[in-house]
A protein has these predicted regions:
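Short amphipathic alpha-helices in soluble, non-transmembrane regions
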Residues: 65-74
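Short S/T/G/P-rich N-terminal loop/turn motif that feeds into the first structured element of a domain
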Residues: 1-52, 60-64, 90-103
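Conserved catalytic core of Hanks-type protein kinase domains
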Residues: 58-59, 71
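Conserved short beta-strand edge segments in small beta-sheet-based binding/regulatory domains
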Residues: 75-87
């Protein structure tokens, strides 16, 4: 599975209020327990004061991510980018360093 950074921002206060209600309903109906096996949340941060949040997830595809996020798409701007954690970054840098030594 690939790791992704999901960044999101509500477009206005009304959308944030509606999104908050949706989140409460999703959470109270077992939302986190109903995620597919091929979708894992590593971290979730939301700054309610400015309507901006970030999540780091692992998923088998972008399609899996969009299935989780589609209810909120009309309320917020969402961007998804591949990312790595510290161990993965160090491993990649070491690999690149080794490859340049043999050139």
């Amino acid at each position: 599975m690939q790791r992704y950074l999901i960044s999101y921002e509500f477009t206005d206060g009304e959308d944030q209020e509606e999104g908050g209600e949706m989140l409460i309903n999703w959470y109270e109906s077992g939302g986190p327990q109903n995620r597919p096996e091929n979708y894992e949340v590593h971290s979730w941060i939301f700054m309610v004061q400015n309507g901006i949040g970030h999540s780091v997830v692992s998923a088998d595809s972008l399609e899996t991510i969009w299935k989780q996020w589609h209810p909120w798409r009309r309320l917020m701007d969402i961007s998804i980018q591949p990312c790595m954690d510290l161990d993965e970054t160090v491993g990649l840098l070491k690999k690149q360093k080794m490859n340049t030594r043999f050139v």
